[in-house]
Amino acid sequence: MQQRITINLNTDSKTTDKTTILEYCRSHGIAGIETPCGGKGTCGKCKVTVAKPYYKDVLACQTKICDGMEIIVGRKESTGTKEDSMVVLTNGENVSEKFNEHVNRNVEDTLAACDIGTTTVVCYLIDKETGQIISTRSGANPQRSFGADVLSRIDAAARADDNDKANGGLQMMQTQIVSLLNGWISEMLTECGRTKVSRFSVAGNTVMCHLLMGISPEKLGKAPFMPDEYFGREFNPLDIGLENCQTMIIFPAVSGFVGGDITAGMMETVNCNELTLYLDIGTNGEMALGIGDRYVCCATAA
C-alpha cells in the first residue's frame, strides 16, 4: 500500500536538511522501505518516489530531505496482487472454533512463546493447563528497515546518534520489536478473553535477543564474536516496555552465533538416544549434530 508523506522541517524537531529519506521514515515509524544492505546504498532496494519539488525515483538511503518535500513510499496496489509479497506460514491449525473454550481463565493459566527471527517473527498464546496453542500471530520483523541480515543490524546498532540517543539504531530497533510484540499479545489476550500472560518465553538468535533487550550487539561483529549476554534467565518485561506479561525468560545462547533459537529446539532431543541432526534454516542458519547431552554446533548465513 502506498503512502504519500509531506515533510515539514519547521514543525519537526527530529529532522534537519541533512537527514536522509530513510532516516526520516525510520524515526517516524513509516514502514514500506526495504534495506537489505542496511542503508549503505549498495543494494538499490530502497527506492521511493519524490513527488515534490521534483518528480523522480530515488534511493531513500542516499537522498536528503528538504522542507515541503513530498515522497511516495510503498508498492502500488494492483488487482490480484497481495499488498506484501512476504507471507509467513504457520502450522495451519484452525483454532478459531476453540476460543470460547478458554474465556475467563486467570493469568496463571496463560503462557506465551515467541521466536524472533531475523526476517520473520512468530508469537503463540498457550493454555497452560492443556498445552494447547489458542492463538497465533506471525509477520515480518520490522527491523528489516535496518538491513536484511544480522551483520547489517549490528552495524546499525553501533551507529547511535550521539545527539539523540532515543533515535539511535539500537534504541529504534528495540522499540520496533517491542511495539510489535505488545500489539500482538494485546490482540491475542483480547481474542481469547484473557487479561495477562504469566510467563513469556523468547527464542531467537543472539543478535535478535540483544536488540530486544536494548543491549549493543557490537561485539558480535568482530572477533572473537563474544556476546555481552548469554541470556538463559528471567527478565522483568517492564524493563523493556513489554506489557501484559508477568515474567519473561530468554532461551540461552551457546556461543556468539549459536543462539537461543537452536537451544530451544535442541531441548526436544536431549532425551533421544539416537544420533540427531537439528537444522534451523533461516536468514541466520544453525546446525547441531549429537546424541543425548553432547552436541556439536555451527552457524552461518543461510
Where are the model-predicted features located?
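Fe-S ferredoxin-like electron-transfer domains
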Residues: 53-113
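Conserved phosphate-binding catalytic cores of ATP/NTP-utilizing and phosphoryl-transfer enzymes
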Residues: 92-109, 247-276
